[in-house]
């Protein structure tokens, strides 16, 4: 099954799912053999892109990569599973360079969030992140930043869409943040960080005294 779909560089306004289907269908008719698409593929590509940001380029990328996934698996028809694979690939392709290019100190903060989540925590407090971060800095041979500076790095990760950090009131103890990662479930952020920053291997292999909540 050969495809003549190729990446394009065109500026589109945000579209809804129905409009995105109208964009995809003529492209598919020109570039993909008849009967090579499951009927649900174009509606799914359109719905996923509309839910994300309404960008027609994303819808076209989803369709193109779905076809590539089908070709690689030697499938006779592009199916929903290929669209899901394409969605994962796009997410990974978008987030990987962002994680790789984080400064070391911000990688250490992100590591501290992830390792606490792996320990079963969610809605992690700023203090819990900072305590783990101090241990991570020790394993990396780095001097820890102040808690105020780390709070700023957390905010940067939030703005980048890597984590969520929602402010909550602790009454007379002031404000805190409840922090969770936003990474795709199958995305191995630790591997990405260690490949970009070799010292992260020492951090990942280090020992940590992590908190458990009753």
Task: Indicate where each model-derived feature is located.
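A short helix-turn-beta junction within AAA+ P-loop NTPase domains corresponding to the substrate/partner-engaging
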Residues: 1-14
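Conserved small helical "lid"/interfacial subdomain of P-loop NTPases
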Residues: 12-53
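P-loop NTPase nucleotide-binding module
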Residues: 23, 51-54, 101-104, 108
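Short amphipathic alpha-helical elements of helix-turn-helix/winged-helix folds
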Residues: 48, 69, 112-116, 132
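The conserved phosphate-sensing helix
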Residues: 52-67, 76-79
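Conserved C-terminal helix/linker of AAA+ ATPases
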Residues: 69-94
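Short alpha-helical segments that sit at the start of domains
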Residues: 92-123
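Terminal-proximal interaction/regulatory segments of ATP-powered molecular machines
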Residues: 120-214
């Amino acid at each position: 099954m050969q495809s003549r779909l190729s990446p394009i560089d065109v500026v589109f306004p945000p579209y809804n799912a129905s409009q995105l289907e109208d964009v995809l269908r003529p492209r598919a008719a020109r570039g993909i053999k008849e009967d090579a698409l499951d009927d649900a593929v174009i509606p799914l590509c359109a719905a996923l892109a509309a839910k994300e940001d309404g960008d027609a380029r994303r819808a076209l990328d989803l369709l193109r990569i779905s076809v590539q996934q089908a070709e690689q698996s030697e499938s006779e028809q592009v199916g929903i599973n290929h669209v899901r694979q394409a969605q994962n690939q796009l997410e990974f392709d978008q987030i990987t360079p962002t994680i790789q290019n984080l400064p070391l100190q911000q990688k250490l903060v992100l590591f501290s969030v992830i390792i606490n989540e792996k320990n079963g925590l969610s809605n992690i407090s700023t203090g819990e992140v900072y305590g783990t971060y101090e241990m991570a800095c020790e394993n990396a041979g780095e001097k820890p930043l102040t808690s105020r500076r780390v709070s700023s790095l957390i905010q940067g990760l939030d703005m980048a869409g890597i984590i969520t950090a929602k402010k909550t009131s602790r009454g007379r103890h002031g404000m805190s943040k409840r922090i969770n990662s936003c990474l795709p479930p199958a995305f191995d952020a630790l591997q990405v960080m260690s490949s970009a920053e070799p010292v992260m291997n020492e951090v990942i292999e280090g020992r940590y005294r992590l908190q458990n909540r009753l």
